[in-house]
């Protein structure tokens, strides 16, 4: 059973700050004084008195969210979906703005869903409590909490009341998920998240703005999880979802699009890009989404090098295949970029029309399990000797650099430790040769290989 709480409210009332406070992660949801910063639903995992609870941070409802027919309408649909999903709805309002007409409208809307409602009056620091209390008590809601998400005022009392509520309602709470079993979880350290789950594969979906990343993740999750819009930069934060498919756990991170540095103009975009790059240190597999109509750009090549440098397995997803002719597909596959990365698989899809997407899970499995494949030390040393025979190490100060043996250091990424003398003098060209040689002989499609060179110390040199 998954117990779920949704944080609902107007824009800029402190929902994301409260989300970060409750989940114990300062940087999980983007929080700022800018209105409408959160655009997609974000899920967090909190534990209150040994009770595991899913927390949903929803986009802020604007004054005219129901009237607009573009992005604001999409945001409102995200909010309604979260309300339906939730066992408890926490309506967050701002004490500084006092009670607004929009707050009353939201309460009326929530009552139609027949959900239990907690009213959270946020930003009470420095205000006259009696005046604030009187104004919001006129709403007639029984469960009311006066808090400061920034300073932590009233948070402990709130969490205890949440736990008491779920304890009293535990017999009536039951969830049944169709098509996919969806589980949401988060911890303070995402490197250890889902450690109690077996075979959790973490996947980041990365690419330039407006290449179809959010559309793809909605298809993979079989639900409208993130907002899709034709304007670049719709996704601002790094959203994640965990699904179970064929008894394997997949944690997907949908990230903000990364433009060239000289085109990043706003502070919010800088934060979003920084968080996207940090995710590369947390995931096992990266789906690099490229607009097949545009072909490979310098920015795509930069992102690919960044992914490989971080040791992630990578699959190139060429989206918008429905718009390509056969000749255009051949030209894309014959690009210079692909010839440099023969170990990386490319796959054509149309996320919009759900074409070619079903095989993506198979490609993810292949890339991930290749990265943790057990390889005997004797085979590694045998491949190393063959590489040296075909192309000897360079000479340094009249002596040839000596490479002795190699073994596996760790997996995911596969790290091979090579021992020898004066290995620090090896050129980058020769190191690249060895990496490519191991890649071809081990046939680890989609997986990165990292070589670590360890020189033996001369006992006669002090």
UniProtKB/Swiss-Prot annotation:
Instruction: State the CDD domains in the record.
Output: EngA1, EngA2
Domain EngA-type G, chain residue ranges per copy: 3-170, 201-372
Q: Which Pfam families match?
A: KH_dom-like, MMR_HSR1
Entry's Gene Ontology BP terms: ribosome biogenesis
- Is Nucleotidyltransferase tagged as a keyword? no
Q: Does the keyword Nucleotide-binding apply?
A: yes
Cleaved signal peptide residues:
none
Question: Which residues make up the binding site for GTP 1?
Answer: 9-16, 57-61, 122-125
For molecular function, the Gene Ontology terms on record are: GTP binding; ribosome binding
Where GTP 2 is bound, by residue?
207-214, 254-258, 319-322
InterPro entries from the UniProt entry: G_ENGA, GTP-bd, GTPase_Der, KH_dom-like, KH_dom-like_a/b, P-loop_NTPase, Small_GTP-bd
Q: Which Gene3D superfamilies match?
A: 3.30.300.20, P-loop containing nucleotide triphosphate hydrolases
Q: Which UniProt keywords apply?
A: GTP-binding, Nucleotide-binding, Repeat, Ribosome biogenesis
Q: Which residues form the KH-like domain?
A: 373-457
Superkingdom assignment: Bacteria
Listed under subunit, the entry gives:
Associates with the 50S ribosomal subunit.
Q: Which family does it belong to?
A: Belongs to the TRAFAC class TrmE-Era-EngA-EngB-Septin-like GTPase superfamily. EngA (Der) GTPase family.
Q: Which NCBIfam families match?
A: GTPase_EngA, small_GTP
Function, in words: GTPase that plays an essential role in the late steps of ribosome biogenesis.
Name of protein: GTPase Der
Q: Which organism is it from?
A: Buchnera aphidicola subsp. Baizongia pistaciae (strain Bp)
């Amino acid at each position: 059973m998954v117990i779920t709480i949704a944080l609902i409210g107007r824009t800029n009332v402190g929902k994301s700050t409260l989300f970060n406070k409750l989940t114990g992660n300062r940087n999980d949801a983007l929080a700022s004084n800018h209105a409408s910063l959160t655009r997609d639903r974000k899920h967090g995992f909190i534990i209150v008195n040994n009770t595991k609870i899913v927390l949903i941070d929803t986009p802020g409802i604007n004054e005219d969210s129901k009237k607009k027919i573009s992005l604001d309408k999409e945001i409102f649909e995200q909010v309604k979906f979260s309300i339906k999903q939730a066992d408890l709805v926490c309506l967050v309002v701002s004490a500084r703005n006092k009670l607004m007409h929009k707050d009353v409208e939201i309460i009326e809307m929530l009552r139609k869903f027949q959900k239990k409602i907690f009213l959270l009056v946020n930003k009470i620091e420095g205000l006259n409590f009696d005046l604030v209390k009187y104004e919001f008590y006129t709403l007639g809601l029984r469960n009311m909490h006066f808090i400061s998400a920034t300073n932590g005022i009233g948070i402990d009392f709130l969490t205890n009341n949440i736990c008491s509520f779920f304890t009293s309602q535990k017999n009536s709470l039951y969830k049944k998920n169709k098509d996919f079993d969806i589980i949401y979880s988060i911890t303070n350290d995402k490197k250890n998240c889902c450690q109690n789950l077996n075979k959790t594969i973490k996947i980041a979906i990365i690419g330039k703005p407006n290449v179809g990343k959010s559309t793809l993740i909605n298809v993979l999750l079989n639900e409208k999880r993130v907002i899709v819009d034709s304007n670049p930069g719709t996704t601002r934060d790094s959203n994640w979802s965990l699904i179970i498919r064929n008894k394997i756990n997949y944690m997907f991170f949908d990230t903000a699009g990364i433009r060239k540095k000289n085109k990043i103009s706003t502070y919010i975009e800088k934060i979003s890009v920084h968080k996207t790059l940090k995710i590369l240190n947390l995931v096992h597999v990266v789906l690099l989404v490229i607009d097949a109509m545009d072909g490979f750009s310098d920015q795509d090549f930069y992102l690919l090098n960044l992914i490989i440098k971080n040791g992630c397995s990578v699959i190139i997803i060429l989206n918008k295949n429905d718009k390509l002719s056969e000749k255009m597909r051949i030209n894309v596959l014959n690009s210079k970029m692909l010839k440099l990365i023969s170990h990386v698989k490319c796959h054509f899809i149309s996320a919009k029309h759900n074409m070619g997407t079903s095989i993506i899970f198979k490609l993810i499995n292949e890339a991930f399990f290749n990265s943790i494949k057990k390889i005997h030390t004797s085979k590694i040393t045998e491949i190393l000797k063959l590489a040296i025979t075909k192309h000897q190490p360079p000479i340094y100060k009249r002596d040839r650099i000596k490479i002795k043996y190699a073994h596996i250091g760790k997996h995911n990424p596969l790290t091979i430790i090579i021992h020898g003398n004066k290995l620090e003098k090896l050129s980058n060209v020769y190191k690249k040769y060895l990496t490519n040689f191991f890649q071809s002989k081990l046939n680890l499609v989609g997986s990165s290989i990292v070589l670590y060179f360890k020189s033996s110390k001369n006992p006669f040199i002090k």
